[in-house]
């Protein structure tokens, strides 16, 4: 492509070469550019005048030419870039064509983004464009609409883009500085920190704070790699609450000063108790003060900037235009006011400014951070699609969906605004969060935030609670499919989702089953939790009926002023001389069509028509708090209700009581004290919404007035909760239920039965409701939702009955342990559900052990009578150690490594003193070598104590961390070489160390795993018919083990394993559960099988160890048995390892490891250091003699793997200390 292009090609404009003011060229000009380029490429096309049609028809052809990598490829790439330039210049009106364009790239998106990144960055930096932000939002919208993960592909292609968007480096600097301050505060000085800390990041931070240098720990792959044996964190878990509305109300006085008050809405009442527990908790919300471009424009600054550019910059701030980048601070700082005249006035002004008021609020409460978006976007997102489409649709009231959304163009435009606002909330949430935090998103305004957050950082735990019903009509997924499917898919991207009622969750699951046929749905009957896995994401769904903070209402009940208000109100409503059997009905709600106010009034009118005897007696006091009058559907509905209320008062009059009015209709709300007084004054509460998430009014009424009756519709979530709890049944009806609010006759019957209910019966029913609500308050609701134990990520208590149950449970713990190891190594704090999982697994196994023992019994199959007896002492011990490890790793102590390693003392088979001496000897050997070029080690018996069976021998998390840190700090090339298979219950299945720390050699070194893209095998195995001999032996032995007397050998130890080049049949375990006679009988039968399939003994060789029988296939070259020495040679050949260089550490525990040691001694007799885990004197002597034959005395012996792990940990600490000291010396110099 380096040759000079033909003259005709020079006429094709360079993509992304226009200045900001020239970006919006005409479609006609772009058409001519594309036509010319297509002609040069000789691509056939229809010369249409519609640019979208042309792009849609030629994008795939351009991609094909570009992928060919021929002389025309560069020109085709230029065409693709011109199309991208157009799409990013028309983000909103051109998104449909952008989706087609991205789809046409197929599997080439990553390489395409790499090609185009330079063009985009150069344009933004040199010409003032904002194409980078346009691309980020366009891909976000694409992912939302299609369910793909194209945004993550962009991050993979250009990693720095995500960092700059989220301010990752700034956040890391802040966290390091906080970490450093805490260390300095504890130890008092720089010097003491150096002397006691095992974390060199502290010293590096000191240097970098002073010099501003960049450290290697800020690398993309491992941004938080700890500098010590174990990672620590000084930040505790916070709750980050994210909602559209804030928990406060803001008011600006005429003086310009701001006043902030605690809000009183339902969301605040629900969440405030949780948020107030910790001042570090954070609430993100929109304060109603957003960016208005029209108000912010200044002469010559932004008039030429296209309105189609997105609303966030690369730091996630809502700043479209570079020339008004400071607008966010203008919004909060109130700089439109006159400058203060003196310092005192300046200080007072600062304190009463919005920024000052918020700062003062944050000092005494949890932190409140504003989310600022474009005002036009917000108006469309909130007043348009949220309340004009989502609200009525999710309440199953399609007749109230705004008619403008019948226009697909308007629907898409408003949907873009909804996505943009969710995008901004998601960016702000990620930027303000830490990995250990729980981010709690609320309600239908922000249903896409979880999906967008996961694309930015998949390590975050993000929950969502829907406060309204989820009952969308069928047309939501046909007529409004753009919105419907994105909402359905978006909820599945949260870690956990809470619904108000079982009805809503059931509806959601039915829709997922119908529209996402491949989704896997699992129900846990004990926990009443669904887990749904779709497109690689898993979400847990629970039901959590929201409640109230009882004390917020009860504190008013007995106050003298409340009693007076109650009496005055009852007298005002019922009159001076009310009828003895007259009833005070009370209803209070927002003036919303979902509340069923119109239907209530119609039923109340019918009530007096059918029961004229109630005229002059009963009064309904209806409070309908006016809201959303600016929305046409609300205004019309409210006016019609008021007209009907006036009509009722005109129709029904009592000649004997002229002052009586059947209805008191009020549109102003009441303060809390007066509301409680109304609850106390009423006889019967009326809560009858068409559809409502929960409706807390019913609970407030009965908490305050246990003697009151209740008329409740099935549209209220609280009614479903009461029914589920048994408070309304055939035998016991504690309230008057309305099943159909649209049937005025049955509705008025409920009024009538409530009015005639005897007071003592009514009080008894009210008491039962009161007791239930008191026992299920808001604290219980929030704790239940935040409880980490109910998510799919947690191993729940389970009944372990069969071997499959046991092995499956252990594999689940492997997954948890891998996450623990990965997080600790990266410095990411550990979530609480890891400890819950391990504790649940441990307790599940303890429950099946015989009393006073660690002997577990498992059935060999679900319907089998055979019982396997396992000693699971090691498995339980490793659970206990890992739980202890989690506690230590989260401590702030600089010596948490040493503290945890000290706990391993109890594992020594002899004594504490022996443990300490062995560790000292092993550490001295490691110290003498200083550093190792190569580390070769066995696994089982060396790094891991033997378990009852191989599938249960999961590497514990603490071991994974110690081994990985040793590999990172003390050796260059680390290798685990074992006789176990590689996969299918092999060494990779039971390991918890992340890829990249160790090479894994399996089957004695005949098969190797280097990394995901690099594996190889020994090619010396006999081929053709000769290779079938081992397979024949395996088949014969499998059949043998199916016989009843040999069945126990299928589950003892490693069972029957087929390796690459040999077989292993366990005939004993470490607990000696198999008798000598049984083992001898098995050995004899296997000998017969081997002789039958290889009568001349030229192909197979039988060998026995303490625990198993091995059937080896001889090599093709000289017919000897392949051993670990051969495996090591194979590795050196394939990976070009030169063992003559540097020091080599070899660790083993049995005679099968001797060839590995010998091969190393042959190549590097002086540089080999070896530690053996054994108490066998004969084996010790063999090792000593072998080393002595090469004039090598670098030998140490330990009694158990835990001693070796302790020594490795100590060596790692020493290596870090040396490294730290060297770095400090350099800094001092």
UniProtKB/Swiss-Prot annotation:
Keywords of the record: Glycosyltransferase, Transferase
Top-level taxon in the UniProt lineage: Eukaryota
SUPFAM superfamilies (alphabetical): HAD-like, UDP-Glycosyltransferase/glycogen phosphorylase
UniProt feature coiled coil, ranges: none
Catalysis: reaction(s): D-glucose 6-phosphate + UDP-alpha-D-glucose = alpha,alpha-trehalose 6-phosphate + UDP + H(+)
Residue intervals passing through the bilayer: none
Enzyme class name: transferase
Gene3D superfamilies in alphabetical order: 1.20.58.1800, 3.30.70.3080, Glycogen Phosphorylase B (3.40.50.2000), HAD superfamily/HAD-like (3.40.50.1000)
Basic and acidic residues bias locations: 213-225
Stated role: Catalyzes the production of trehalose from glucose-6-phosphate and UDP-alpha-D-glucose in a 2 step process.
Name of the protein this chain belongs to: Alpha,alpha-trehalose-phosphate synthase [UDP-forming] 2
Source organism of the structure: Caenorhabditis elegans
């Amino acid at each position: 492509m380096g040759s000079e292009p033909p003259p005709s090609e020079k006429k094709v404009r360079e993509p992304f070469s226009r200045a900001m003011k020239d970006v919006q060229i005409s479609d006609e000009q772009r058409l001519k550019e594309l036509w010319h380029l297509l002609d040069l490429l000789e691509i056939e096309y229809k010369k249409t005048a519609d640019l979208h049609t042309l792009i849609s028809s030629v994008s795939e052809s351009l991609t094909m030419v570009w992928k060919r990598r021929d002389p025309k490829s560069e020109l085709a790439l230029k065409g693709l870039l011109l199309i991208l330039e157009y799409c990013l210049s028309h983000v909103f009106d051109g998104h449909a064509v952008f989706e087609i364009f991205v789809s046409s790239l197929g599997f080439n998106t990553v390489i395409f983004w790499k090609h185009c990144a330079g063009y985009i960055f150069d344009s933004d930096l040199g010409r003032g464009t904002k194409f980078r932000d346009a691309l980020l939002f366009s891909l976000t919208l694409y992912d939302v609409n299609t369910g793909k993960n194209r945004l993550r592909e962009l991050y993979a292609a250009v990693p720095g883009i995500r960092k700059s968007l989220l301010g990752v480096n700034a956040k890391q600097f802040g966290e390091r500085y906080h970490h450093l301050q805490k260390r300095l505060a504890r130890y008092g000085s720089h010097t003491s920190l150096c002397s006691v800390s095992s974390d060199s990041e502290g010293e590096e931070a000191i240097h970098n704070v002073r010099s501003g240098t960049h450290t290697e720990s800020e690398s993309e792959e491992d941004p938080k790699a700890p500098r010590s044996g174990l990672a620590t964190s000084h930040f505790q878990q916070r709750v980050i609450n994210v909602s559209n509305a804030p928990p406060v109300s803001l008011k600006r006085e005429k003086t310009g000063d701001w006043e902030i008050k605690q809000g009183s809405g339902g969301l605040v009442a629900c969440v405030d108790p949780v948020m107030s527990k910790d001042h570090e908790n954070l609430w993100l919300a929109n304060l109603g003060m957003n960016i208005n471009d029209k108000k912010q424009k200044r002469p010559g600054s932004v008039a030429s900037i296209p309105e189609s550019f997105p609303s966030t910059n690369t730091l996630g701030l809502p700043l479209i235009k570079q020339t008004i980048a400071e607008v966010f601070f203008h919004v909060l700082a109130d700089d439109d006011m006159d400058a203060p005249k003196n310092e005192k006035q300046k200080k007072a002004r600062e304190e009463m400014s919005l920024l000052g008021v918020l700062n003062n609020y944050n000092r005494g409460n949890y932190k409140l951070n504003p989310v600022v978006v474009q005002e036009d976007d917000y108006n469309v997102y909130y007043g348009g699609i949220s309340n004009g489409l989502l609200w009525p649709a999710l309440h199953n009231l399609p007749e109230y969906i705004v008619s403008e959304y019948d226009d697909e163009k308007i629907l898409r435009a408003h949907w873009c605004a909804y996505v943009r606002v969710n995008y901004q909330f998601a960016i702000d949430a990620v930027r303000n969060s830490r990995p250990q935090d729980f981010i709690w998103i609320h309600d239908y305004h922000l249903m896409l935030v979880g999906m967008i957050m996961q694309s930015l950082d998949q390590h975050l735990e993000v929950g969502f609670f829907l406060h309204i019903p989820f009952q969308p009509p069928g047309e939501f997924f046909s007529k409004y499919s753009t919105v419907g499917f994105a909402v359905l898919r978006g909820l599945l991207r949260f870690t956990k989702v809470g619904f108000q009622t079982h009805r809503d969750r059931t509806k959601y699951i039915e829709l997922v089953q119908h529209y996402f046929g491949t989704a896997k749905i699992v129900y846990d009957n004990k926990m009443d939790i669904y887990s749904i896995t779709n497109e690689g994401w898993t979400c847990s769904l629970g039901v959590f009926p929201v409640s109230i903070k009882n004390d917020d209402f009860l504190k008013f009940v007995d106050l003298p002023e409340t009693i007076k208000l109650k009496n005055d109100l009852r007298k005002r409503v019922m009159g001076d001389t009310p009828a003895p059997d007259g009833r005070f009905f009370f209803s209070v709600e927002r003036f919303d069509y979902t509340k069923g106010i119109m239907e209530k009034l119609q039923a109340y009118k019918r009530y007096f028509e059918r029961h004229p005897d109630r005229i002059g007696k009963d009064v309904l006091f209806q409070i309908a708090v006016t809201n959303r009058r600016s929305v046409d559907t609300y205004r019309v509905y409210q006016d019609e209700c008021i007209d009907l209320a006036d009509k009722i008062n005109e129709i029904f009059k009592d000649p004997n009581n002229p002052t009586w009015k059947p209805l008191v209709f009020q549109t102003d709300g009441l303060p809390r004290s007066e509301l409680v007084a109304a609850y106390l004054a009423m006889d019967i509460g009326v809560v009858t919404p068409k559809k409502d998430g929960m409706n807390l009014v019913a609970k407030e009424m009965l908490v305050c007035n246990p003697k009151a009756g209740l008329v409740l519709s099935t549209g209220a979530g609280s009614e479903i909760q009461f029914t589920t709890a048994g408070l309304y049944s055939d035998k016991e009806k504690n309230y008057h239920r309305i099943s159909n609010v649209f049937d005025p006759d049955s509705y008025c019957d409920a009024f009538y039965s409530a009015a005639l209910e005897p007071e003592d019966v009514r009080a008894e029913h009210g008491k039962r409701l009161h007791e239930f609500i008191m026992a299920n308050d808001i604290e219980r609701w929030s704790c239940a939702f935040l409880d980490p134990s109910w998510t799919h990520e947690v191993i729940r208590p389970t009944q372990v009955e069969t071997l499959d149950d046991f092995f499956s449970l252990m594999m689940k713990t492997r997954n948890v342990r891998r996450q623990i190891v990965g997080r600790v190594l990266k410095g990411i704090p550990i979530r609480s559900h890891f400890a819950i999982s391990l504790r649940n697994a441990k307790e599940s196994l303890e429950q099946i052990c015989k009393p006073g023992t660690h002997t577990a019994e498992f059935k060999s199959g679900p319907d089998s009578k055979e019982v396997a007896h396992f000693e699971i002492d090691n498995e339980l011990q490793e659970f206990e150690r890992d739980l202890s490890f989690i506690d230590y790793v989260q401590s702030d102590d600089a010596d948490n490594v040493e503290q945890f390693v000290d706990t391993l003392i109890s594992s020594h088979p002899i004594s504490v003193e022996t443990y300490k001496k062995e560790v000292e000897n092993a550490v001295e050997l490691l110290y003498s070598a200083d550093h190792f070029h190569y580390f070769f080690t066995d696994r089982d018996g060396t790094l891991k104590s033997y378990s009852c069976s191989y599938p249960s021998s999961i590497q514990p998390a603490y071991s994974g961390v110690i081994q990985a840190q040793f590999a990172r700090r003390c050796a260059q090339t680390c290798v685990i070489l074992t006789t176990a298979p590689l996969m299918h219950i092999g060494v990779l299945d039971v390991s918890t160390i992340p890829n990249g720390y160790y090479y894994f050699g399996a089957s004695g070194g005949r098969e190797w795993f280097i990394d995901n893209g690099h594996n190889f095998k020994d090619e010396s195995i006999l081929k053709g018919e000769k290779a079938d001999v081992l397979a024949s032996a395996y088949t014969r032995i499998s059949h043998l083990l199916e016989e009843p007397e040999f069945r126990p050998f299928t589950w003892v130890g490693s069972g029957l394993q087929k390796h690459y080049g040999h077989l292993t049949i366990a005939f004993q375990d470490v607990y000696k559960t198999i008798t000598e006679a049984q083992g001898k009988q098995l050995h004899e039968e296997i000998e017969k099988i081997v002789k039958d399939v290889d009568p001349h003994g030229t192909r197979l060789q039988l060998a026995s160890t303490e625990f198993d029988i091995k059937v080896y296939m001889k090599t093709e070259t000289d017919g000897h048995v392949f051993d670990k020495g051969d495996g090591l040679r194979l590795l050196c050949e394939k990976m070009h390892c030169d063992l003559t260089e540097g020091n080599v550490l070899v660790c083993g525990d049995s005679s099968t490891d001797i060839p590995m040691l010998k091969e190393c001694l042959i190549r590097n007799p002086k540089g080999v250091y070896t530690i053996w885990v054994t108490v066998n004197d004969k084996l010790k002597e063999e090792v000593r003699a072998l080393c002595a034959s090469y004039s090598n005395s670098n030998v140490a012996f330990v009694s158990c793997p835990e001693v070796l792990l302790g020594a490795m940990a100590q060596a790692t600490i020493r290596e870090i200390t040396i490294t730290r000291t060297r770095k400090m010396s350099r800094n001092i110099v």
